[in-house]
């Protein structure tokens, strides 16, 4: 990514793929579902009701992009359709009282560590933990679809590559 100098010349300012953490949003849904599958607390054909496309958590809404939601769908469709309500309901149903187990699984996946040690400037991912002072009732549902989390694009890509390469 290039910046522009006062003289009108371009220079490489920052490699955003490794240099800046972002909230991964919907790309984190697969990571959340992978944690539940790995913990064997769900299976891919399990059904979830998307609740008309809106869920309420402590007065805050989780919404699907599709008005009215998707009805009853299975876990695979929740990922395929990128259903916020579906994925949040699935994860909340199995980890609501065990959020530490969920986050520990994420840490076990290695996503809380930088991936490219040979390149300077890669920030450490921010994966909230129930022991953090800032953890609250919204932390788990928001994390489920990538909010409150910070990862660089290369860190997200590395996780997806491990799935594509069957865990390697």
Model-found features: residue ranges?
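Beta-lactam-recognizing serine transpeptidase/beta-lactamase-like catalytic domain environment
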Residues: 1-25, 31-168
């Amino acid at each position: 990514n290039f910046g522009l100098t006062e003289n009108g010349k371009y220079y490489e300012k920052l490699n955003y793929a490794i240099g800046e953490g972002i909230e991964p949003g919907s790309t984190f849904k697969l990571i959340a579902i992978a944690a539940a599958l790995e913990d064997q607390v769900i299976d891919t054909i399990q059904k979830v009701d998307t609740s008309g496309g809106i869920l309420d958590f402590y007065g805050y809404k989780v919404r699907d992009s599709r008005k009215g939601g998707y009805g009853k769908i299975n876990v695979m469709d929740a990922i395929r359709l990128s259903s916020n309500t579906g994925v949040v309901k699935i994860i909340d149903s199995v980890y609501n009282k065990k959020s530490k187990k969920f986050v520990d699984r994420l840490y076990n996946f290695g996503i809380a560590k930088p991936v490219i040690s040979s390149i300077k400037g890669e920030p450490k991912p921010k994966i909230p933990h129930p022991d953090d002072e800032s953890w609250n009732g919204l932390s788990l549902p928001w994390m489920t679809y990538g909010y409150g989390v910070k990862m660089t694009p290369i860190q997200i890509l590395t996780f997806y590559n491990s799935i594509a390469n069957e865990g390697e």
